[in-house]
Amino acid sequence: MQKLRTINLTKIMLLLLAVVGCTGQSLFVSYNMTICYVATLLGVIILIIRKKIEKIEGIHIWFLLVTIYIGGSILTSKFSIQTTAYFRLFLCIELVFLIGLKEEYKLYFINLCKGLASIVAISIILEVIIPDLFTEYFWFIATPKHDMGVLATLSKNIARGYYSGFACEKSAAAYIMNIGLACIGAEYFTNEKMKKINYIWAMLYLVGILLTGKRMLLAIPIVIYIIALLSLKKKNKITTILGSIILGIAIFYIASNAIPQLGVTFQRFSMYEDDTLRGRDNLWLYALALFKTYPFLGVGYGAYNKMASMWGLTTGDGIAWSTNAHNIYYQLLAETGIIGTCLFVFLFVIGIVTTIKKIKMFNRNDYKPILLFSLFVQMITLLYGLTGNPIYTVNELIMYGISLTFIAKCTLEKK
């Protein structure tokens, strides 16, 4: 009975975290922190029932050091409320480490992510067919309080050819499509083949990214795919790459004739003025200025927006800045100083290195997709971190943290 209760609570906890990680800026966004707190409470209950915690070792040590550092920095943070909120999220992930997820739970979480990504992909396609799907018919998914500003932003994006579907924000939607591709890719590179239905899902995820207009989040899965082919596939690497390019071009040509909006992303690649780097250099300058002023401890994790706004950073309408530095590395320097940034960089590097080592060390196919999923999510996070805010958005921070827990507790048969 005790074991059954633990199993059910663990699955509920993972379901809640998957909902946070893979639903974007939809109606759940207002409750993301609350959902994470409930998941944290469930984690505590699970540990109490089990009366034991997992051994702290490997990547867990580095994550714990980062968590302790963020917790300690609350005392020196210029805006402790923001730092405290993020600290609670890190504690939530820390509890998942302490619980020590078994293989079945990790596969369960991956399947949840794939299911949610599929829902978002289908909703993006539906939004192309019915442009006012989430601004008129299902507006409560985008904004339960019927915020006209949110609906106006969605309408403006749709008018420009940028779709986000159920995720209700183009960057969030493109990120979720990347997670869907990570699920599919983990299966493919485990067996060098996959179910036919998953080829269809892979195409839908790619189409979903194209319809969001987010170039960086389109480039990332392509880069990861090529790297994975060169390093993981055992034979016909070049042939597979060339075949994938030809097939991709053919599919895009056919699909773009049926859905003209697919061309928006590629049109934006050729535009000089765009939102990949436009204005970001200014955000980075503020981050570097904060780092120079507070070089050792920084201004506090999550405090960039408040501090930069105090120093004069605003939107074009003169509203205080609220969407971070669009580069996690510059922002870490500003918020955690040289000490905290070093801890994070060690966490990033050791996470990738440890995952690759375990992929090579263990040969059980039923565990390999878990490690590959973890590797792909980590790579998405670190690459997207060059122009985005993946460790500052609740959804994406949770996904990155969970991916790290996946490389802990590996008790597999060695080669």
Protein language model annotation of sequence segments:
Residues 110-144, 149-159, 165-231, 379:
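Alpha-helical transmembrane segments of multi-pass inner-membrane proteins
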Residues 41-44, 372-415:
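Transmembrane alpha-helices of multi-pass inner-membrane enzymes
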Residues 2, 15, 37-52, 178-190, ...:
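Hydrophobic, aromatic-rich transmembrane alpha-helices
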Residues 270-289, 293-336:
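Long extracytoplasmic/lumenal interhelical loops at the membrane interface
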Residues 1-50, 66-76, 381-383, 402:
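N-terminal signal-anchor transmembrane segment
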Residues 122-132, 232-271, 288-293, 301:
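A membrane-periplasm/extracellular boundary helix in multi-pass inner-membrane enzymes
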Residues 63-68, 79-101, 111-117, 124:
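Aromatic-anchored transmembrane helix interface
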Residues 58-61, 118, 197, 222-230, ...:
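Hydrophobic transmembrane alpha-helices and their immediate junctions
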